[in-house]
């Protein structure tokens, strides 16, 4: 029996996307690597973010709309005492300020206050569109437009770690929740300035990163 072409296979690949790559770029590279006819992902991760990006191939692309509505989990690392124009590590530093000593009981109280249904204003540096233009394209030109708040739900925020100038949080949230906005809002309640140093999506509902190959290992993983 001859080898089965991957182009005829259907399924979902949990790709461990690296930082610095757009979700669409990861999708197209995986589609080409696996020689798939149809491919789609289940919701973009920011280029800065790393972690699990479910990729649907061929007949499995019909599942993507259901996965888009699933809850998300993120590990968020935030640098304190620095603010950037984008709210994350990709932006230009606008201001630096001393970081006061962390008060963990007060911090936990603040975190609890940011759970539940909330209205969140999307950041300018996002892929949302305004009159046909991506917001990040306008932001790079120095243009800021009004963004209506959108309802999202933060189910849980846990303090995973902390240091003199950073916080590490595990966030369980609904789709469409912007971690940079959530982080800035939380830290503004305790500290003057902060930015998101990095974000990792460690799992998507049940799956964990242990099941997800990086892009370079996608083909042997899929074939296995």
From Swiss-Prot:
Gene3D superfamilies: Pseudouridine synthase. CDD domains: PseudoU_synth_EcTruB. One of its GO terms (molecular function) is RNA binding. The active site is at residue 46. Keywords: Isomerase, tRNA processing. It catalyses: uridine(55) in tRNA = pseudouridine(55) in tRNA. GO terms for biological process: mRNA pseudouridine synthesis; tRNA pseudouridine synthesis. It holds the Pfam family TruB_N. Responsible for synthesis of pseudouridine from uracil-55 in the psi GC loop of transfer RNAs. Belongs to the pseudouridine synthase TruB family. Type 1 subfamily. PANTHER family: PSEUDOURIDYLATE SYNTHASE TRUB1 (PTHR13767:SF2), TRNA-PSEUDOURIDINE SYNTHASE (PTHR13767). This is tRNA pseudouridine synthase B.
């Amino acid at each position: 029996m001859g080898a089965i072409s991957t182009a005829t296979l259907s399924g979902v690949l949990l790709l461990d996307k690296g930082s610095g790559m757009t979700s669409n770029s990861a999708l197209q590279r995986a589609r080409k690597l696996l020689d798939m006819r149809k491919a789609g992902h289940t919701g973009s991760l920011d280029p800065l973010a790393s972690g699990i990006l479910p990729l649907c191939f061929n007949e499995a692309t019909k599942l993507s709309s259901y996965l888009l509505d699933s809850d998300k989990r993120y590990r968020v690392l935030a640098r304190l005492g620095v603010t950037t124009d984008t709210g994350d590590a990709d932006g230009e530093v606008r201001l630096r300020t001393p970081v006061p000593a962390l008060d963990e009981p007060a911090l936990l109280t603040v975190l609890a206050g940011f759970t539940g249904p909330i209205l969140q204003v999307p950041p300018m540096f996002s892929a949302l569109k305004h009159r046909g233009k991506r917001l990040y394209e306008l932001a790079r030109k120095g243009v800021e437009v009004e963004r209506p708040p959108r309802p999202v739900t933060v189910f849980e925020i846990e303090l995973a770690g902390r240091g003199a100038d950073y916080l590490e949080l595990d966030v369980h949230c609904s789709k469409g929740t912007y971690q940079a906005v959530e982080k800035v809002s939380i830290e503004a309640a305790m500290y003057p300035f902060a930015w998101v140093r990095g974000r990792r999506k460690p799992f998507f509902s049940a799956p964990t990163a242990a099941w997800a190959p990086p892009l370079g290992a996608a083909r042997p993983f899929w074939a296995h």
